């Protein structure tokens, strides 16, 4: 596997490439053209500029997160083919620039949902958190206003102000979309893009819905083992794979994370590994990556990835705000650097333990 860090670009990220380069074991970044609207084509020139900037810092672009899917594609509206054609052109340009991993999601309206961006933990750090009670007590239109004050002056993915300003229109677009229709639209999209993925060896890695259940009555389908296996079977192509995000699938305590990993052997193209601390099944907060700080056994998650021969990019996910850092919530430098080092340490211990066991 290759340890990476998510980076939003020098215009939007408080973390610099030079800082990322100094994290032991991190050799690449997962990045995006953050100022490109969903549905627009990524030009080769912009991709080349992005790669050159990353390479100048001694790193490389290990993958893209995300090439966002336009709502016309998710809803199956009359103009979806225009936006799919643009998506295919973007994939072709990425392939020509030797980029072979694209993380994306198929979540309606909201990318991910948290009700707090700065919940204080016992150690004084602040973290992202979710309570179903808070969601049930608020209108979708008021959701952005309720959390925007804790964004630290940054623009968070999936919560862009210009998108949130259209939230009523977005909900209207999805009023006739249920789980089955969303699956149909995902299948149509995947069938259209697989030829260009085959041509350029591009692995599409769908990100799970977060949290892994319906929010505000919206359909959510990438939520559990059964549904993800269905997605892979309906478009049975090795380039149709997943981003295994422990912190997203893990929002539903019924999901057995190590078992899911083993069932997805060969189709996990990218991994996000983080920990959550549950106060109840629908009240959780993000924790340090260390197993004892949260609910998940991080050793077992990494062991499962090792056992299936996972060799793709991996990254620590949302970090705490610690040591006075002011950054995009979840995406500061310090705690993610600690997380990367911890995950690398687990991997090295597992790898050497297996090797020494084999020698005996």
Model regions and ranges:
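Aromatic- and acidic-residue-enriched segments that line the glycan-binding/catalytic groove
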Residues: 109-164, 223
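A short glycine/small-residue-enriched secondary-structure motif
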Residues: 22, 58-74
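Glycine-rich, proline-tolerant flexible connector loops at the mouths of alpha/beta enzymes
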Residues: 32-49, 216
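Aromatic-lined carbohydrate-binding surfaces of glycoside hydrolases
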Residues: 66-73, 105-114
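Histidine-acidic metal/acid-base catalytic patches
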Residues: 1-4, 9-14, 51-55, 72-76, ...
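Glycine-rich, positively charged N-terminal anion/phosphate-binding segment
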Residues: 13-17, 23, 41-60
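Conserved beta-strand positions in the central sheet of alpha/beta enzyme cores
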Residues: 28-30, 63, 103, 205, ...
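Short, well-ordered beta-to-alpha junction loops that form the rim of enzyme active sites
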Residues: 104-108, 208-210, 317-319
């Amino acid at each position: 596997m290759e340890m990476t860090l998510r980076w939003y670009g020098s215009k939007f990220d408080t973390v610099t490439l030079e800082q990322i380069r100094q994290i032991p074991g991190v050799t690449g970044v997962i990045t995006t053209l953050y100022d490109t609207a969903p549905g627009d084509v990524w030009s080769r020139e912009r991709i080349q500029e992005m790669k050159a900037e990353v390479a100048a810092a001694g790193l490389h672009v290990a993958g893209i997160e995300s090439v966002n899917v336009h709502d016309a594609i998710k809803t199956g509206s009359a103009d979806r083919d225009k936006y799919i054609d643009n998506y295919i052109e973007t994939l072709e340009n990425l392939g020509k620039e030797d980029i072979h991993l694209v993380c994306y999601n198929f979540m309606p309206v909201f990318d991910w949902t948290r009700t707090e961006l700065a919940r204080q933990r016992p150690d004084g750090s602040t973290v992202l958190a979710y309570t179903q009670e808070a969601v049930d007590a608020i209108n979708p239109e008021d959701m952005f206003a309720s959390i925007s004050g804790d964004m630290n002056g940054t623009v968070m993915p999936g919560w862009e102000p210009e998108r949130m300003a259209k939230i009523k229109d977005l909900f209207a677009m999805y009023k006739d979309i249920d789980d089955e229709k969303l699956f149909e639209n995902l299948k149509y999209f995947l069938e259209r893009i697989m030829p260009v993925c085959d041509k350029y060896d591009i692995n599409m890695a769908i990100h799970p819905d977060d949290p892994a259940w319906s929010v505000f009555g919206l359909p959510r389908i990438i939520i559990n083992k059964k549904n993800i296996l269905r997605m892979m079977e309906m478009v049975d192509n090795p380039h149709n794979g997943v981003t295994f995000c422990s912190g997203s699938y893990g929002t539903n305590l019924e999901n057995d994370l190590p078992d899911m990993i083993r069932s997805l052997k060969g189709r996990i193209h990218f991994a996000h590994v983080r920990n959550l601390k549950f106060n109840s099944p629908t009240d959780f907060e993000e924790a340090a990556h260390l197993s004892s700080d949260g609910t998940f056994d991080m050793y077992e998650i990494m062991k499962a990835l090792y056992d299936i021969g996972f060799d793709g990019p991996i990254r620590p996910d949302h970090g705490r705000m610690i040591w006075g850092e002011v950054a995009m919530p979840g995406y500061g430098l310090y705690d993610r650097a600690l997380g990367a080092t911890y995950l690398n340490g687990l991997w090295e211990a597992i790898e050497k333990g297996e090797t020494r066991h084999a020698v005996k």
